[in-house]
Amino acid sequence: MNNLIKYSTFLISDLFDVVIGKTIDGNKAQRNENGTPYITRKATRNGFEFMIDGEKEKLYSGKLPVITIGNETSKPFVQEFHFFTGTKVNICIPKLDLNRNHLLYITTMIENATKMFSYSYTINSTRLKSLKILLPIKGEEPDWDYMNTYISKILSNMEKNFDVQQNDGVSDLRSLKDLSWSQFKMDEIFSINSGVRLTKADMKPGNIPFIGATDSNNGITEFTSSTNASFDGNVLGVNYNGSVVENFYHPYKAVFSDDVKRLKLKNYPNNKHVLLFMKVVILQQKVKYAYGYKFNATRMKEQIILLPTKADGTPDYEFMEQYMMRMENKVVGRTTEKEAD
């Protein structure tokens, strides 16, 4: 928090109209990959569950962007597209014309203010309306320019490390069922390196992502200027502690907690698409591990994973890359179509 900026508290009800979703059972709805997002109270993936075809009268089709907050999880997310959601999700509709950056700033303030809530004491719409959050001010009003600039700088620093999104060329159109699959130890596929312990007391504020053992925010738990031997990029960060087996791809340079292992491919150039394929493969092992049964380096090296293979029995990295390019192209195409509407 900037010590030169003045702050004041505001009620959520001063800033937002709070409504709840409609009665809808997403599990019974018709799933359609070209449908509309179904947002739930989950604390990950921006609340996104899957795409569905739902009844139009139950669609949130109002002002955008908005913030959604699940009752039990109290996790706020910014939604920029219209969506379906149920009665356990609160929709915060800005009373002013606020942009994504404003709402991203506010979600952080909401998270700071909702730590007292839990599954036994949920943040329903009544409690949410009376929730107080701390915001920077200019005079007596929220300093929207400061919030917008602050988030813009953070996003700009991160986006410098990403390639410009484009529709990748794909030549391999095989499906997963068309392939041969074989078992491999993770140690055959990856170099596995540890993170380094960095305590809050030793952590200095900055713009370098700090990767912790969380299941959300792409693993980012803080931003720091402190670096150590774990400073790395273009890797998979795999949690061996905390939210065990959860893993995220980090194209940007980051500092990694000692609860997170850094994985790089041994026999193929590290790239976003192959590592994202591996992310899903590794997540299939999550059911085996828990807080009392850590996914430590020894177990990680011996863990068996199933991968598509070539005729010679080696992993088909080229297919993995092409397959994830296809998935990415679908998302890029869908997003472009919605932005054009």
UniProtKB/Swiss-Prot annotation:
Keywords: DNA-binding, Endonuclease, Hydrolase, Magnesium, Nuclease, Restriction system. GO terms for biological process: DNA restriction-modification system. InterPro entries: Restrct_endonuc_typeI_TRD (IPR000055), Restrct_endonuc_typeI_TRD_sf (IPR044946). It is an enzyme of class 3 (hydrolase). One of its GO terms (molecular function) is DNA binding. Its cofactor is Mg(2+). It catalyses: Endonucleolytic cleavage of DNA to give specific double-stranded fragments with terminal 5'-phosphates. The keyword DNA-binding applies. The keyword Magnesium applies. DNA restriction requires S-adenosyl-L-methionine and Mg(2+), and is inhibited by S-adenosyl-homocysteine. SAM may be a cofactor for DNA restriction. It holds the Pfam family Methylase_S. Its EC number is 3.1.21.4. Belongs to the type-I restriction system S methylase family. The specificity subunit. A B, G, H and S subtype restriction enzyme that recognizes the double-stranded sequence 5'-CGAN(6)TGC-3' and cleaves bilaterally and symmetrically 10 base pairs upstream and 12 base pairs downstream of the sequence to release a 34-base pair fragment. Methylation of the recognition sequence occurs on the adenine in either one or both strands; seems to methylate restricted DNA. This subunit degrades DNA in a non-specific manner. Heterotrimer of two A and one B subunit. Both subunits are necessary for DNA-binding, which is sequence non-specific. This is Type II restriction enzyme BgcI specificity subunit S.BcgI. It comes from Heyndrickxia coagulans. The gene is bcgIB.
